[in-house]
Amino acid sequence: MQADFGEYWMHRGDTRRVKVYFFASVMSHSRHKFTYFSKTPFTSELAIYAHQLAFRFYGGKPREVIYDQDRVFVRDENLGDVVLTKAFQAFVSSEHFQCVFCRKSDPQSKGKVENVVKYIKYNFLRGREFTNMEMLNESSVRWLARTANGLPHGTTKRIPAEAFKDEQPFLAPYVGTPAHPRDGMKEYLVRRDNTINFHSHFYNVPTGTYNGSGTFVWACAKEGHVEIYSNETGKQLVRHPLARIPGEAVLDETIRRTKLPS
């Protein structure tokens, strides 16, 4: 199985736009697809929940899952070996599947799911009006059955749902119950000096994050740290230790010197 994340601006009926974030997965042989949408960026815990939903959808677990080296999963890299986040390491250990992380210079090694992310954006989301997240996820299930998994695949020429009947018996049993996390993710206004006020403490974000009044990021407290995520991409921007002194400013000098990629 290959897995990845995406994001997309959707229109509401009142002419406003809303950013949605999604998890996508695809079975490598059959091209059987799954997706799950969220109103907030994916943390480790929310990504675990999306995996649980995918395993339930497929009726089993793959032996191997291929990913990018995303901060949702990877905390550090040591001599070429990735160090998983605490939550994701516990999940992988409990579910007994192997993680394979693409080298940063070789994203094509998970090209199947990158194509699925584009397919979701331009076949399912484009032109669709946003009502609420529950209806969006319900609509995606019908779209998966009718279109993504119900029509012949352009490369294999097989219908993914039919091809999956040959692949499904090789999956390991999944007996878990998906549980949505409560991580308290909220939006925070970015100040001109590229900081946010989080619980009366100031934390900096990469230079260039501020893009005029009305620039927001997502943030939550977790395991003694503040995790800050981009509103645009859903990717983690920085992870700070929680401040201990009221009004304290926590500044990471490395991101003060490094601008966001344009």
Model-derived features with residue positions:
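Mobile-element integrase/transposase regions
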Residues: 1-34, 43-46, 93, 185-198
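Active-site beta-loop-alpha junctions of metal-dependent nucleic acid enzymes
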Residues: 36-61, 243-247
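Acidic/histidine-rich, metal-coordinating catalytic segments
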Residues: 60-80
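RNase H-like two-metal-ion nuclease catalytic core shared by retroviral integrases
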Residues: 67, 78-79, 99-121, 136
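Two-metal-ion acidic nuclease core segments, chiefly of the RNase H-like superfamily
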Residues: 81-99
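Active-site-proximal acidic segments at structured loop/helix or strand boundaries
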Residues: 117-220
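Protein C-terminal end segments and domain termini
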Residues: 223-262
